[in-house]
């Protein structure tokens, strides 16, 4: 996120901002293709572990993590 803020201050073009925003998605997709499973940083409400994406579990706060 710090890289995004610094680029925005420097007057980054739309292409640079799109690349910065999409990098996280690309990294997660690549890890899934490699078989490495990590819980994405997406707020998803849950009641049981099955409500969450692969690699996540339902936490006591009612969200996947």
Swiss-Prot record:
Annotated keywords: Disulfide bond, Knottin, Protease inhibitor, Secreted, Serine protease inhibitor, Signal
Protein name: Trypsin inhibitor 1
InterPro entries: Prot_inh_squash (IPR000737), Proteinase_amylase_inhib_sf (IPR011052)
General function of this protein: Inhibits trypsin.
Any GO MF annotation of the entry: serine-type endopeptidase inhibitor activity
Disulfide bond annotation, renumbered to this chain: 39-56, 46-58, 52-64
Residue(s) at site: Reactive bond: 41-42
Family: Belongs to the protease inhibitor I7 (squash-type serine protease inhibitor) family.
Secreted in keyword set: yes
Keyword Secreted: yes
GO CC terms of this entry: extracellular region
Domain notes: The presence of a 'disulfide through disulfide knot' structurally defines this protein as a knottin.
UniProt xrefs under Pfam families: Squash
Predominant location: secreted
Localization: Secreted
């Amino acid at each position: 996120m710090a890289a995004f803020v610094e680029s925005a201050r420097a007057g980054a073009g739309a292409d640079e901002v799109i690349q910065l925003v999409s990098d996280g998605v690309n990294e997660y997709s690549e890890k899934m293709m490699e078989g490495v499973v990590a819980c994405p940083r997406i707020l998803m409400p849950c009641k049981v572990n099955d409500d969450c994406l692969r690699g996540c579990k339902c936490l006591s706060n009612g969200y996947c993590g």
